[in-house]
Curated annotation (Swiss-Prot):
Disulfide bonds: none annotated. The gene is ykzF. This is Uncharacterized protein YkzF. It holds the Pfam family AbbA_antirepres. Coiled coil: none annotated. Transmembrane segments: none annotated.
Length: 65
């Protein structure tokens, strides 16, 4: 999913609500884990910067929650 589509489909309030639900129910870390796994196994291709950001975000979720 492209980030631009999120802004086109959902209001800022809806985006925040959805993000809070994902975080509160710990789905966010599962989604991050799955995305990173797909990248590492070659199922998905992303640039190095995006990969590093995903790993950093994953680590923050693991250690801060």
């Amino acid at each position: 999913m492209r980030m631009s589509l999120i802004g086109e489909r959902f209001t800022e309030e809806e985006q925040k609500l959805l993000l809070n639900i994902l975080i509160n129910h710990e789905y966010a870390i599962e989604l991050l884990s799955s995305e990173i796994n797909d990248i590492e196994t070659g199922t998905k291709n992303v640039d190095g910067t995006t990969y590093k950001k995903l790993v950093t975000l994953y680590d923050r979720f693991r250690f801060e929650n």
